[in-house]
């Protein structure tokens, strides 16, 4: 499982011109589910992102996590994160999870974020989406779950 995390002042996702998810201060998470990912990877990713200390404290240091700043999450499914561009000019998506499994784990991930006390909004799985955001920093991280054993 891979994620791109961006600290934002605000973010929204629209489908066919209609806003389907919107947050204020928090993180935009682009989430890619790969073959072999399961609940353990989604749990790890939710725990890591919710508790990642990427917000400034009173001294300006990155020392606070989403719950401490009352931040929100906008989660957007992004199968292209599983893309392999090492050969040729067209990406290969051989490692992307099947849509049914990816949707199940995407939904499970969002549930785990909610259970950890962070409000989460989302896009629509497999929809053609437009994502708008105001970066804060910018601060961007790429996370990948530890290798499966």
Swiss-Prot record:
A motif (Gly-cisPro motif, important for rejection of L-amino acids) lies at residues 137-138. It comes from the Bacteria. It is found in: Cytoplasm. The keyword RNA-binding applies. It is an enzyme of class 3 (hydrolase). Keywords: Cytoplasm, Hydrolase, RNA-binding, tRNA-binding. GO terms for biological process: D-amino acid catabolic process. GO terms for cellular component: cytoplasm. It catalyses: glycyl-tRNA(Ala) + H2O = tRNA(Ala) + glycine + H(+); a D-aminoacyl-tRNA + H2O = a tRNA + a D-alpha-amino acid + H(+). GO terms for molecular function: D-tyrosyl-tRNA(Tyr) deacylase activity; Gly-tRNA(Ala) deacylase activity; Ser(Gly)-tRNA(Ala) hydrolase activity; tRNA binding. The keyword tRNA-binding applies. Pfam families: Tyr_Deacylase. A Gly-cisPro motif from one monomer fits into the active site of the other monomer to allow specific chiral rejection of L-amino acids. HAMAP family: Deacylase_Dtd. An aminoacyl-tRNA editing enzyme that deacylates mischarged D-aminoacyl-tRNAs. Also deacylates mischarged glycyl-tRNA(Ala), protecting cells against glycine mischarging by AlaRS. Acts via tRNA-based rather than protein-based catalysis; rejects L-amino acids rather than detecting D-amino acids in the active site. By recycling D-aminoacyl-tRNA to D-amino acids and free tRNA molecules, this enzyme counteracts the toxicity associated with the formation of D-aminoacyl-tRNA entities in vivo and helps enforce protein L-homochirality. This is D-aminoacyl-tRNA deacylase.
């Amino acid at each position: 499982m891979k994620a791109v995390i961006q600290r934002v002042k605000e973010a929204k996702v629209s489908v066919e011109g209609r806003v389907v998810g919107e947050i204020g201060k928090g993180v935009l998470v682009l989430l890619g589910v790969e073959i072999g990912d399961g609940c353990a990877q989604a749990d790890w990713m939710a725990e890591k992102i919710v508790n990642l200390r990427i917000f400034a404290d009173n001294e300006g240091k990155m020392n606070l996590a989403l719950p401490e700043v009352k931040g929100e999450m906008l989660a957007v499914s992004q199968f292209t994160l599983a893309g392999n561009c090492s050969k040729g000019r067209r990406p290969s998506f051989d490692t992307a999870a099947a849509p049914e499994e990816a949707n199940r784990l995407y939904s499970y991930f969002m549930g785990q974020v909610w259970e950890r006390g962070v409000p989460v909004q989302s896009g629509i799985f497999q929809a053609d989406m437009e994502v708008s955001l105001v970066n804060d920093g910018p601060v961007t991280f790429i996370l990948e779950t530890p290798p499966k054993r």
